[in-house]
Amino acid sequence: MNLDESSDFFKNADDVVDGGTSIFKYTEVKTFTAEETNQWFIDNVKPDYKPPYKPGTMVEEIELTETTTFVRVYDNMPNGSGMYGSWVMKAEDIEGLTPQEIQNKFALPNTPKYVCDVELEAGTHIRVGEVNALDGWGSGGGTQYDLIGQRIGDFKNERLLEGN
């Protein structure tokens, strides 16, 4: 299989992402550079948005082919983050980590205190890529999923993060 054929294969096939205990199926819709995606946030969210994706990497827009549950972490403080938001991750990507380690891995502006489940329906389009290191927030390196500015998902099962 040559490069063009393998690219077509992944665009048209259901891929299984296996990062430990969770497996979910999706279809790749489009691939962007991190720089293109970071510019989208500046153009569509706010001009001083910190670049969330690591420069020099690729960001994929995917379509979930089955209902999938992610998690979201937040601090629930005034001027902080809340239960409802645009960024999620796989549960096993934070399993066993302290709140400070989660903040560092996902370059969060505040140390999270809570976690909730976020159920996204089949057919939902989201983006996935590597977290950028951000001064004062964290070194990044985790795999993050963003909801592309959509107000979607069922946010439920709020609970304290272990270590709080």
Language model feature labels by segment:
Residues L3, D8-N164:
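Catalytic toxin/effector domains delivered as secreted proteins or via bacterial secretion systems
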